[in-house]
Regions:
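Hinge/lid segment of periplasmic solute-binding proteins
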Residues: 1-55, 206-209
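Extracytoplasmic/periplasmic solute-binding protein
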Residues: 27-49, 54, 78-132, 138, ...
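Long, aromatic- and glycine/proline-rich binding clefts that accommodate carbohydrate-like moieties
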Residues: 29, 208, 270-339
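Extracytoplasmic/periplasmic substrate-recognition and gating elements
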Residues: 66, 130, 151-156, 198-284
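Glycine-centered hinge/linker elements that transmit conformational signals in sensory
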Residues: 81-86, 124-169
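Conserved C-terminal helix/tail region of periplasmic/extracytoplasmic solute-binding proteins
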Residues: 305-406
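Transmembrane alpha-helix signature in integral membrane proteins
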Residues: 392-400, 487-517
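Short membrane-interfacial helix/loop motifs at transmembrane-helix boundaries
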Residues: 425-429, 447-487
């Protein structure tokens, strides 16, 4: 905060926040823990530049080939799916719209989710806690439309049954090549405030806001480059061997950050681009700000309008505490819905009955995924359920400890030597074997130091919400409870057991059986 207030360009926190798009402000200025000598509360945690939004790109030549107006992008979802239908022709290697696949394909689904009026996560304004929130009817409507784009059954001109009008590809490189080769009619891509599509040929490619959904607006992702200073900076020696205090390192970091986010840096960038003959690729904002208005004639006004509308309607990616994995958790219900379609269990058709039943099924899938996300990603479990899980975890921990002690006791008994004459256990017999014990001391100390000490000190992670940076919190048996009630963990155990059985059966028993057969079978 003090750096912002002392900066000649910002001068105050309010002035700094006013310089940012409205959607970016809550990300950089929010509640946080006490760090770096600052009290817990609202602080500026980062400074951002290079604002990015996602917009809809379309190929004008493909639109024209499909009988669509090359200058008329889809304005709503009805037009979007109609355009995708008319463009899609797999026999000619043409696809209506590009959609991401893979383990985090829901990243591409977010635009549909937001445009339907739903959200992936929301924050409680009173408590500040984040919750998954995609188990709503609006989210089901978004998923239904997304599924239609990806799986709707239709026949191409050759009479072949096709599914969907999209690519659903997780390979970014192949998607990029398909864009360049003119195989994709529509796709979403980033627009930056520094170039704003300036590297795209406006005669071939159009840029528009994402089509409006049931909410009446088309909402896409807003992103930005955010720079912050590590709170745990400590003094250290530089490359010349001189000690540099932590405060001086922070000052140097801020000097770099403030310059990279300053008007001076933007001016240098604009001048350099113009001098290199790249003035046409600069955004209208930069061209006006630094007086290169002669290049504005090369820039379609609709592109700037698309950027501004996306900035107004868009939302930042989920940024709350523990929300980093939301795309993985949100992809799971999408995959479940896809599998239901493949299995023929998802009602098809546009009749009110089929659509209502389909939406009910999709919402049920999303609601289960929402509860799963809150429990596993956010860590929010109802107190009664948490108490039950903790009780089970304590019982299991006691059983494990008892079994461990029993096994160790029996191993100790087996390896404890007995006198061959009396049958009694022998003692340590230090007087007789002192030299042997002395020789063993270095080895024992080494084993204790490098094996058992790390194991004992590291085992405290079992009882902690461990943080690499910051304070780790003691959570008792909550970690064990989380594992015991995790479907993924039990699935991993089952898969490990199956792999072991296959390995033993095929790799160990099969050769033995084969050898016996070869030996016993008469020739």
């Amino acid at each position: 905060d003090k750096y912002i207030e002392c900066d000649p360009e910002y001068k105050s926190i309010d002035s700094f926040l006013n310089s940012l798009p409205a959607a970016i402000g809550p990300i950089v200025y929010r509640e946080g823990p006490a760090v770096g000598g600052l009290a817990a509360g609202k602080h500026v945690w980062a400074v951002g530049n290079k604002i990015l939004v996602r917009a809809l790109f379309w190929r004008k030549d493909i639109f024209q080939d499909a009988g669509l107006g090359p200058e008329k992008p889809p304005k709503n979802w009805d037009e979007l799916i109609e355009y995708a239908r008319r463009i899609a022709d797999p026999a000619r290697d043409k696809y209506g719209i590009s959609m991401a696949g893979g383990a985090q394909s829901s990243w591409d689904f977010m635009s549909y989710l937001w445009s339907a009026g739903a959200d992936a996560v929301t924050q409680d304004k009173k408590t500040g806690e984040w919750r998954a929130a995609f188990g709503t009817r609006e989210a089901a409507v978004a998923l239904d439309f997304y599924m239609r784009l990806a799986t709707e059954r239709w026949q191409d001109s050759d009479g072949t049954v096709q599914h969907g009008y999209s690519t659903l590809n997780s390979d970014e490189r192949s998607v990029k090549l398909a864009q360049q080769a003119g195989k994709l009619g529509m796709y979403s891509q980033y627009l930056g405030d520094d170039r704003m599509g300036g590297e795209v040929d406006p005669a071939l490619v159009g840029i528009a806001p994402f089509p409006a959904g049931p909410s009446g607006r088309g909402a896409t992702e807003i992103n930005a480059t955010l720079n912050g200073i590590f709170a745990g900076i400590v003094g250290r020696n530089n490359s010349e061997g001189k000690f540099v205090p932590a405060e001086k390192i922070r000052d140097a970091a801020w000097k770099y950050i403030s310059f990279m986010n300053s008007k001076r840096a933007r001016k240098i960038y604009a001048e350099t681009m113009v001098n290199l003959g790249q003035g046409r690729s600069l955004s209208p904002t930069y061209l006006r700000e630094f007086g290169y208005t002669e290049y504005l004639k090369y820039f379609p006004p609709s592109w700037e309008q698309a950027f501004n509308q996306a900035l107004e309607n868009g939302k930042p990616e989920p940024y709350g505490r523990n929300c980093q994995m939301v795309y993985i958790y949100l992809t799971q219900p999408i995959d479940e819905a896809m599998q239901l379609f493949r299995d023929g269990k998802l009602p098809e058709g546009d009749s009110p009955e089929a659509k209502e039943k389909r939406l009910d099924m999709l919402q049920e899938i999303l609601k289960k995924a929402e509860n799963r996300t809150n429990a596993r990603m956010i860590g929010h479990i109802e107190p009664q359920e948490q108490q039950k899980r903790t009780t089970v975890a304590i019982i299991v921990a006691i059983i494990i400890a008892c079994v461990f002690c029993f096994v160790i006791y029996n191993i100790w008994k087996v390896f404890s030597p007995k006198d061959s004459y009396s049958g009694k256990k022998r003692g340590w017999d230090f007087k007789r074997n002192w030299l042997g014990y002395l020789i063993m001391i270095p080895a024992l100390v080494s084993i204790l130091l490098w094996t058992y000490y790390p194991m004992l000190t590291g085992s405290q992670l079992f009882f902690q919400d461990y943080r690499v940076v910051g304070d780790s919190r003691w959570v008792g048996f909550d970690n064990l409870a989380g594992v015991l009630f995790s479907d993924e963990w039990w699935s991993a155990i089952w898969n490990t057991f199956r792999y072991m059985m296959f390995t033993l059966t095929l790799g160990f028993l099969a050769p033995i059986v084969l050898a016996i057969l070869l030996q016993e079978v008469s020739h």
